[in-house]
Amino acid sequence: LAQRAGITIDAKGAQLNQREQELRDRIRACNREAARYFFRSLTQDDAGGVGRAYLLNERGLSMAAVRHFGLGYAKPESFGLVNYLRDKGFTDDEMITANLAYQSKTGHVMDRFRDRIMYPIFDTVGNVIAFGGRALNKEDKAKYINTNTTPVFRKSNNLYGYNFARKAHSDHLILAEGYMDVIALQTAGFAGAVASLGTSLTE
């Protein structure tokens, strides 16, 4: 058809675009499995007791809210998520590209999020594209660790909670400060509550 129409197709470019799309699909799938792992760690594992205590007792959330927002817990293990994702068929490179793992100086691929409450970040259609992780250990120097730029996520282009606001057909948005503020507002009936993920917003 292209020949008949006199159109030249860039085969290399098409192959590159296909590889990029396949990588994005794999990163989204990797994030989805990671979210399941974090959620089960929070709601079912004994190790998740500290996370449940923080969310349910200290912050006053209900289990319904935990489920709705897909909250989770990253256990204080070095290889828990890495081993889980390997068992699910994901490669070390995919985990590192998704910013879920990193390679240590000794060459080991290790979990990036440890002993943290995990807030999955969704795109507008509900795909998990990133995470925010809040430290539970008060001595941890980094209170929050967030996913860096990946093939599926750029923090300045996304809003936390926007997928839920969009699904609720909210006709206006309320810009809140952080994850828990969005959860509290939306749970209280303010469906348009969202939070920025960077220091500035794009148009």
Q: Model-flagged regions — what are they?
A:
Residues 8-14:
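Charged, low-hydrophobicity low-complexity segments
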Residues 19-67:
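Non-catalytic interaction/clamp surfaces of large macromolecular machines
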Residues 3-6, 43:
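Generic secondary-structure signature for well-ordered alpha-helical cores
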Residues 70-72:
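Aromatic-rich juxtamembrane segments at the membrane interface
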Residues 1-3, 16-34, 75-203:
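Phosphate-handling DNA/RNA-contact segment within nucleic-acid enzymes
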